[in-house]
Amino acid sequence: MTRNWKVSKYQTVTSIKYFISFILFVLITNHVSSRILLRPCAEYLWNMRQTDIFINSSQEERAFLELQRFEDKTRFEILIGEAPQLNTQSFNKKIQEKAIELAKYSNEESIDSIANVFADLLSLCIFVLALLLGKKEIAVIKNLVNTLIYSLTDATKSFFIILFTDIFVGFHSSHGWEILIEVFLKHLGLPENKDFIFLFVATFPVVLDTVFKYWIFLYLNKISPSAVATFHNMNE
């Protein structure tokens, strides 16, 4: 009995270490490959083969809006006396310097986006390979998670279920999904199309909610009917 417990403990600790090391390795690989290996290649391809500064229309709109905001702010500060009076030539030169600054920033952002695409693909390949090679460790972690879930009380299970549903498919979750999609599209250098974002926000949480309810009906209702009953009572 003691020997089996020690073996189980050893397997669990080893699997958790494997999981943590695996996550850290993927994150470090993504960062190193993006910054050191892939970015110089992306910079060469973008600067030598492309004449554009902006990688998509959304990035261009952000730069134009920032330049317009800077110009309006400069005019306002001059009018209220917080900045010295400038002649037309000096004013245009100041705006030009800001435009050059924005152009350089946008160009660097475009290069980063290209490097991010290839770095993410590389990380995905490593992730899949690690899953295939570490089936034993993953199975142990899965058993550990199942044991932890089964050890929870019905009220605790219901609390986490309600928390999960409210965060991901609740009434206010749409704003969070919008931010996540915009950050993801910007990370990959894709245009932040509002129609696509609104369509995703309108459909994906609904699909996720349907899948979750189906899981409760098909799986949780079999292994823990009392937890489902507690969930419905707490939800009401």
UniProtKB/Swiss-Prot annotation:
Recorded topology in the membrane: Multi-pass membrane protein
Main location: plastid
GO cellular component, one term: chloroplast inner membrane
GO biological process, one term: potassium ion transport
This protein's record includes keyword Transmembrane helix: yes
Keyword Chloroplast set for record: yes
Reported function: Contributes to K(+)/H(+) antiport activity by supporting proton efflux to control proton extrusion and homeostasis in chloroplasts in a light-dependent manner to modulate photosynthesis. Prevents excessive induction of non-photochemical quenching (NPQ) under continuous-light conditions. Indirectly promotes efficient inorganic carbon uptake into chloroplasts.
Protein name per Swiss-Prot or TrEMBL: Potassium/proton antiporter CemA
Organism lineage: Eukaryota, Viridiplantae, Streptophyta, Chlorokybophyceae, Chlorokybales
Gene it is expressed from: cemA
